[in-house]
Every structure is written in structure tokens, then in C-alpha cells.
Regions:
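Short, structured patches in soluble enzyme cores that scaffold and shape functional sites
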Residues: 19, 118-119
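Short helix-to-loop capping/linker segments positioned immediately adjacent to catalytic or ligand/cofactor-binding
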Residues: 4, 17-23, 101-107
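Short beta-strand segments
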Residues: 12-45, 62-64, 74-76
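Short, structured beta-strand-loop surface elements
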Residues: 47-114, 120
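Generic recognition of long tandem-repeat/solenoid scaffolds
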Residues: 42, 116-117
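Extreme N-terminal tail/first-helix region
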Residues: 1-15, 72
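Covalent nucleotidyltransferase core used to form phosphodiester bonds in nucleic acids
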Residues: 5-6, 40-44, 48-53
């Protein structure tokens, strides 16, 4: 059902977030994510490749994966957006609820932006 987080993604520890270069090449990255309603939230840095690629092409693919990025389930289409600073607190709370390590100041020191993923 469009807009809902697939059951294969809910409750997973990691997802493989696939973004696309301008030439169409796929780049997959295993990431932590938080869930809230029908959205996923990912923490990252604004100078990371995935953030730059999402600014150019908001279409992404999402699949459950291992810590090393080995995909363990079906892949789903989603749309991603880089959140403005006023929406960071909400994304941070979603991630903090899931990962105790995310609450450590050291983790957030290097994080300066968040992504919101919506399933198509």
C-alpha cells in the first residue's frame, strides 16, 4: 500500500539506502533509520555523497540489510528529501527512540542534516 512502511522494513536495524548518480549509477549505503508514522528518518552530513545525490534526484530504493550492507529482503521505491533545520528535532527523536547510541553527543557532533523517506 503506497505511503505505508513495508512490514519487511519495520523494526529492522539497518536499511540499504540506494541513491542514484546523475549518470544513473546506483550507490547503496547501509544506514540507521528511525520510524515515525509512515516516514523513515536517516541522519547524515550535508557534505556526504548520498545527500548530494538526493538533492539532484529524490528517487531512492530502500531494502532491509545487514550492518555490512548485504540486502536481506525486498527493495522498495521511495522518495527522499533533505530536511530543513527546523525539522531536525523530530527526525532526531525518531532515531533516538530506536538506537541508544544515537543519544551520545559524539554521534551528533558529526551529523548536521537528516533525510526523510516516504514510500511510493
Amino acid at each position: 500500500m503506497p505511503g505505508n512502511i513495508p512490514s519487511e522494513i519495520r523494526g529492522q536495524k539497518y536499511i540499504s539506502l540506494t541513491t542514484f548518480r546523475k549518470n544513473g549509477a546506483k550507490i547503496a549505503t547501509p544506514v540507521w533509520f528511525g520510524e515515525d508514522g509512515d516516514k523513515l528518518y536517516v541522519m547524515t552530513r550535508s557534505d556526504m555523497g548520498k545527500t548530494k545525490r538526493i538533492r539532484n534526484n529524490s528517487q531512492v530504493r530502500v531494502a532491509p540489510c545487514s550492518i555490512r550492507g548485504k540486502v536481506t529482503g525486498p527493495e522498495y521505491s521511495a522518495s527522499a528529501r533533505v530536511l530543513p533545520p527546523e525539522e531536525h528535532a523530530h527526525a532526531r527523536q525518531a532515531i533516538n527512540r530506536k538506537y541508544w547510541m544515537a543519544r551520545l553527543p559524539l554521534i551528533w557532533r558529526r551529523t548536521d542534516t537528516y533525510l526523510e523517506l516516504s514510500f511510493l
